[in-house]
Amino acid sequence: MDIKQTAVAGSLESSDLMITVSPNDEKTITITLDSSVEKQFGNHIRQLIHQTLVNLKVTAAKVEAVDKGALDCTIQARTIAAVHRAAGVDQYDWKEIDSWNV
């Protein structure tokens, strides 16, 4: 998926995550994370966001995530929503997304 504009999903409420996805001219994926649970789960959150981007076939994006203790399913859902908004895609391929769950 090609990121065309900046988009945001989520909130700064407890147990949520606010994620901002923007185009990246460097043609790489960069993830910046601000989390209250950085020491315990920072690497896991980054890996989950990165894997979700890979599953969506995103090859270049700047991602800024502010985590307030979100569960994995919330992190994944917010990432999916932000990427679709940033790519200008209105339709979700639910079969493809569901196939990620093994």
UniProtKB/Swiss-Prot annotation:
It is found in: Cytoplasm. InterPro entries: CitD, Mal_deCO2ase/Cit_lyase_ACP. Transmembrane segments: none annotated. The keyword Cytoplasm applies. One of its GO terms (cellular component) is cytoplasm. Pfam families: ACP. Its main location: cytoplasm. Keywords: Cytoplasm, Phosphoprotein. It comes from the Bacteria. The modification O-(phosphoribosyl dephospho-coenzyme A)serine is found at residue 14. Covalent carrier of the coenzyme of citrate lyase. NCBIfam families: citD, PRK13253.1. HAMAP family: CitD (MF_00805). Belongs to the CitD family. Oligomer with a subunit composition of (alpha,beta,gamma)6. This is Citrate lyase acyl carrier protein. It comes from Streptococcus pyogenes serotype M4 (strain MGAS10750).
